[in-house]
Amino acid sequence: MNAVWTDNDTQAEDLSPQGRVASQLVRLKSDLQAFADATASAPATREPKIERETHKLEKRLCRQVGQAIMDFNMIEEGDRVMVCVSGGKDSYGLLDILLKMQQRAPINFEIVAVNLDQKQPGFPAHILPEYLAKLGIEFHIETQDTYSIVKKVIPEGKTMCSLCSRLRRGILYRVADELKITKIALGHHRDDMLQTFFLNMFFGGKLKGMPPKLVSDDGGHIVIRPLANVAEKDLTRWAAHRQFPIIPCSLCGSQENLQRQLIGQMLRDWEKQYPGRTETMFTALQNVVPSHLMDATRYDFKGLKITGVPDADGDRVFDEETFPMAKLAGVQVLGSSC
């Protein structure tokens, strides 16, 4: 006979088959309830960490944009800045950050959000006006049916991006004049600038990138890229946090430039294999040594003479340059025996 020792405050456990099943069901129910309670409380536990990370992200974005504005004198006292808003994450992020910085900037400047509705089929024309109206800022929606023009000119199956871009650019320059704009702000970020550099190198035979500030091709406008220091992944995170009403960029049916896609994937692969390489390459764009390239229009090789003055950028001629060893993802370098 099975006997269970108990005290006065504890009931004897029923060890019969039915009793064991009932006991297991009670324990299972208790475990499920505990799991449900833990799951319900998890978001509350994660919230402070998410808030901290979001706050750090916001500070980083504002710092990087502010640094670019200062380094390249992008925005000056009294400027009227036209922010080109397409409905993508980058232009939303640019507008959002500039509005934040406008409140704390040491100078006064105006912001005008401008969108060009090119009458692409399926384009949700109500989204941007509603969003911008809620922000309570000055904005302008320019409606021009460039889509029909491009469809007539470009053969079926060919990319429409180039002509579409030229038409869009001309219209935006006109709008900038009409609105008395002094600076045109575009949402290109650090990754765009690096991709453009390699596109020019691989397919154009030029060491040419995407400048943070330039005079427009018509000679009449200053174009700025305040997101020059910002990584695309940070803009993606910020867009998710702010829940921007994103409008897809493929409504026209035209595929993104294949070459740009390939370069973008190459850079992502490099960054995955060699963490930090993207940052190093971007830094290189800001540290150009013309005397160590081969463009005779940028450096007077023919007129080179001995000066007797040491040059920090001068060649050591017989010595190979040494560089820090690249860190491989997941690989620990222990050192050599020599």
UniProtKB/Swiss-Prot annotation:
<keyword id="KW-0067">ATP-binding</keyword>
<dbReference type="Pfam" id="PF01171">
    <property type="entry name" value="ATP_bind_3"/>
</dbReference>
<protein>
    <recommendedName>
        <fullName>tRNA-cytidine(32) 2-sulfurtransferase</fullName>
        <ecNumber>2.8.1.-</ecNumber>
    </recommendedName>
</protein>
<comment type="similarity">
    <text>Belongs to the TtcA family.</text>
</comment>
<feature type="binding site">
    <location>
        <position position="164"/>
    </location>
    <ligand>
        <name>[4Fe-4S] cluster</name>
    </ligand>
</feature>
<dbReference type="GO" id="GO:0005524">
    <property type="term" value="F:ATP binding"/>
</dbReference>
<dbReference type="GO" id="GO:0005737">
    <property type="term" value="C:cytoplasm"/>
</dbReference>
<comment type="subunit">
    <text>Homodimer.</text>
</comment>
<dbReference type="GO" id="GO:0000287">
    <property type="term" value="F:magnesium ion binding"/>
</dbReference>
<dbReference type="GO" id="GO:0034227">
    <property type="term" value="P:tRNA thio-modification"/>
</dbReference>
<feature type="binding site">
    <location>
        <position position="252"/>
    </location>
    <ligand>
        <name>[4Fe-4S] cluster</name>
    </ligand>
</feature>
<feature type="short sequence motif" description="PP-loop motif">
    <location>
        <begin position="86"/>
        <end position="91"/>
    </location>
</feature>
<keyword id="KW-0479">Metal-binding</keyword>
<dbReference type="InterPro" id="IPR012089">
    <property type="entry name" value="tRNA_Cyd_32_2_STrfase"/>
</dbReference>
<keyword id="KW-0004">4Fe-4S</keyword>
<keyword id="KW-0460">Magnesium</keyword>
<keyword id="KW-0411">Iron-sulfur</keyword>
<dbReference type="GO" id="GO:0000049">
    <property type="term" value="F:tRNA binding"/>
</dbReference>
<dbReference type="GO" id="GO:0016783">
    <property type="term" value="F:sulfurtransferase activity"/>
</dbReference>
<comment type="function">
    <text>Catalyzes the ATP-dependent 2-thiolation of cytidine in position 32 of tRNA, to form 2-thiocytidine (s(2)C32). The sulfur atoms are provided by the cysteine/cysteine desulfurase (IscS) system.</text>
</comment>
<keyword id="KW-0547">Nucleotide-binding</keyword>
<keyword id="KW-0808">Transferase</keyword>
<keyword id="KW-0694">RNA-binding</keyword>
<comment type="pathway">
    <text>tRNA modification.</text>
</comment>
<keyword id="KW-0819">tRNA processing</keyword>
<keyword id="KW-0820">tRNA-binding</keyword>
<keyword id="KW-0963">Cytoplasm</keyword>
<dbReference type="InterPro" id="IPR014729">
    <property type="entry name" value="Rossmann-like_a/b/a_fold"/>
</dbReference>
<feature type="binding site">
    <location>
        <position position="161"/>
    </location>
    <ligand>
        <name>[4Fe-4S] cluster</name>
    </ligand>
</feature>
<dbReference type="InterPro" id="IPR011063">
    <property type="entry name" value="TilS/TtcA_N"/>
</dbReference>
<keyword id="KW-0408">Iron</keyword>
<dbReference type="GO" id="GO:0051539">
    <property type="term" value="F:4 iron, 4 sulfur cluster binding"/>
</dbReference>
